[in-house]
Design a protein with these regions (language model features):
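Conserved beta-strand and immediately adjacent loop positions that scaffold enzyme active sites
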Residues: 20, 29, 124
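Compositionally biased, intrinsically disordered linkers/stalks adjacent to structured regions
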Residues: 37, 147-148
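NUDIX/MutT-family hydrolases
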Residues: 106-110, 116-147
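Active-site segment of metal-dependent pyrophosphate-handling enzymes
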Residues: 17, 70-114
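Acidic, metal-coordinating catalytic segment for phosphate/diphosphate chemistry
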Residues: 1-20, 24, 96-97
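Conserved Nudix-box catalytic region and its N-terminal flanking loop in Nudix hydrolases
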Residues: 29-72
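Short, charged/polar surface micro-motifs in flexible loops or helix N-caps
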Residues: 24-30, 38-40, 52, 85-89, ...
Length: 148
């Protein structure tokens, strides 16, 4: 894993490649976490994470689902939803005038397990009916793209 300074240098100079998880339960609700840090601070956002150097997509998917959902899941069990571009005017370090650019590989999956406690990225998780998430101004616009 990169140091904070090296990670910031990457954010300054390159797009990040990440996996977003569009997680649904048996009722069709979508899982969102309340973000506590930039670039999507104070918004509801889907779980996900950046892919690390030399990490295969399958390895990244298993690591990200372990971190976000509490168990490693197989990418083959998810449905690939497409490639998205996310541009933010802010960054994780809060340094002014440095935005964050993500190239996102969105995957949809069903999950009926117990949710893990909140982490340094999210203060809490909640299940949303898709129509209510689309209408909620606190759900980030990038997440609404997945639900429209």
């Amino acid at each position: 894993m990169l140091s904070r300074d090296k990670w910031f240098a990457v954010v300054c100079d390159a797009p990040l490649v990440s996996i977003d998880l569009i997680v649904r339960d048996a009722r069709g609700r979508v899982l969102l976490g309340w973000r506590r840090n930039d670039p999507a601070r104070d918004c509801w956002f889907v779980p996900g994470g950046a892919i690390r150097k030399n990490e295969t997509l399958d390895q990244a998917f298993a690591r990200i689902t372990q971190t976000e959902l509490g168990q490693p899941l197989l990418r083959a069990a998810a449905r690939f939803r497409g490639v998205y571009e996310h541009f933010y005017p802010t960054n994780f370090a809060g340094i002014p005038e440095v935005g964050t650019h993500y190239v996102v590989l969105a995957h949809e999956l069903r999950f009926d397990g117990e949710l893990v406690p909140a982490d340094d990225q999210h203060s809490r998780f909640s299940w949303f009916e898709p129509a209510l998430a689309l209408a909620d101004p606190k759900v980030h616009a990038h997440c609404k793209e997945y639900l429209a």
